[in-house]
Amino acid sequence: MQNNIIIFDTTLRDGEQALKASLTVKEKLQIALALERLGVDVMEVGFPVSSAGDFESVQTIARHIKNSRVCALSRAVDKDIDIAADALKVAEAFRIHTFIATSALHVEAKLRRTFDDVVEMAIQAVKRARRYTDDVEFSCEDAGRTGVDNICRIVEAAIKAGATTVNIPDTVGFCLPTEYGNIIDQVMNRVPNIDKAVISVHCHNDLGMATANSLTAVQNGARQIECTINGIGERAGNTALEEVVMAIKTRQDIFKGLDTRINTQEIHRVSQMVSQLCNMPIQPNKAIVGSNAFAHSSGIHQDGMVKNKNTYEIMSPETIGLKKEKLNLTARSGRAAVKSHMDAMGYQQNDYDLDKLYAAFLKLADKKGQVFDYDLEALAFIDMQQGDEDRLSLDVITSQTISNLPASAFVQVELDGKKISQVSNGGNGPVDAVYNAILAITDMDITMLHYNLTAKGEGAEALGQVDIVVEHKGRRFHGVGLATDIVESSARALIHAINAIYRANKVADLKSHKISQ
């Protein structure tokens, strides 16, 4: 049996399904390239049949990724499989992942079929996928609530049809470790052709068991773990990549000789990137990547740490690429210093625009004095979303609030190269007043669905990141803004969302024009 545990990342498929607003193709590609540097073996990047946007993002990622295998999801339906193959065909190497529900509840209530029908559908789906690639994964949806006899029967049939990976998902997070481990053990010992395929596991965290179930499955013979960065995913989320990888690495007394290809020093950086781009804050006490994961407050713990780090630290923060911040970046620092800090954090220059980053850094350094590495990361990721094609940009903003009186604001923007000013009186607070002014300038009909403010850094001069989700003509758009001033970061978030709407409207107009020709 192989000693390498295959890491199958589904952040861009299962993880993205949990987001309030979809990622752009550019944002998905950023994450995919980061996952490639992290060393994931397989990345599942979308469900191409679901939308033209998903097809485009899968195709774009497939074109750029060279060192990881790109995978797309499809139901056990010919059309799904054909479209997935079409999106993936530009890849260096690709996998088609097809699935069908197998639990009695799903087979009878959702599919309205017999289990014999389901087995035949699985066989035909795998055979069709094998027309396009020799790397086919088959999943028994809701395997956690499927009888073991039926799991073994359909797994054997799928392998005989050509599946090279068979996935046994706990789709609704129902299983406890002992019973899930037993399912994997039964499959290992009862399926006669199991040596011709890799057993994969895909666990959800509804009962908080995703990591434990995945690790127990490995102990019972599974050799692929499906997971996401930070554990993001539907409902309570998926198995967290960083947790299973570091558990295997840290507990070699149990996982003797087993390892992954993951470059663990990239974990912190990728975790932060996914958190920021997906607008999914990481809880402070989150294992491995939370801000408190390596913090020791108790006096007794601190004393032990000073004497010997191993007293309370089972792994070092450096292992996941977490470095202590240095207070040596100021407005006097040059481009080389900024680039050096980005290099030290593991970024390559094609990950960001140094000119834009340095200009944003100087503005922030003038306000803050000292700039930290986490500030640079935030500036790089947020600013690179504000593209050169933006029609709307912020020039000047002022707001005023007097006790018991409505707030007022003055906003000056540049729209299509023309400077426009607007005064707004009667806002329910300064942010509302600024938003009223911007919407008056753009004449945009927008409904605010979500507003979230997060501090990036520490102290009174910390950056404030505002993430919003707005609705326009039935579609949702995400906006993000970053500044030391909350009102300014709020304005920038709205302008970011409006630019996304402008781009979407432009695409719709082009499509309409093409159809009419």
Curated annotation (Swiss-Prot):
Main location class: cytoplasm
EC number per UniProt: 2.3.3.13
Residues bound to Mn(2+): 14, 202, 204, 238
Cofactor: Mn(2+)
Reactions accelerated catalytically: 3-methyl-2-oxobutanoate + acetyl-CoA + H2O = (2S)-2-isopropylmalate + CoA + H(+)
Entry-linked SMART domains: LeuA_dimer (SM00917)
UniProt keyword list: Amino-acid biosynthesis, Branched-chain amino acid biosynthesis, Cytoplasm, Leucine biosynthesis, Manganese, Metal-binding, Transferase
Sequence segments annotated as region (Regulatory domain): 393-517
SUPFAM superfamilies linked: 2-isopropylmalate synthase LeuA, allosteric (dimerisation) domain, Aldolase
GO biological process, one term: L-leucine biosynthetic process
HAMAP family in the record: LeuA_type1
Subunit description: Homodimer.
Database matches in PANTHER family: 2-ISOPROPYLMALATE SYNTHASE 1, CHLOROPLASTIC-RELATED, HOMOCITRATE SYNTHASE-RELATED
Name this polypeptide is given: 2-isopropylmalate synthase
Annotated organism of origin: Histophilus somni (strain 2336) (Haemophilus somnus)
Lineage, top ranks: Bacteria, Pseudomonadati, Pseudomonadota, Gammaproteobacteria, Pasteurellales
